Amino acid sequence: FLAKKLAKHLAKKQAES
C-alpha cells in the first residue's frame, strides 16, 4: 500500500509549510 509513502509525503509538505 502507498499509505506510508503518502503519509511521509504529507508530513514533509506540512513540515515545509
Swiss-Prot record:
Q: Name one GO cellular component term.
A: extracellular region
| Major location category of this protein | secreted
In what tissue types does this protein appear?
Answer: Expressed by the venom gland.
Domain of life of the organism in this record? Eukaryota
Q: Which GO terms describe its molecular function?
A: toxin activity
Keyword field: Secreted, Toxin
**Membrane-crossing residue ranges in chain numbering:** none
Annotated localization: Secreted
Q: Does the keyword RNA-binding apply?
A: no
Into which family does the record put it?
Belongs to the cationic peptide 04 (cupiennin) family. 05 subfamily.
Name listed for the protein in its UniProt record:
Short cationic peptide-5a
The protein's organism comes out as Cupiennius salei
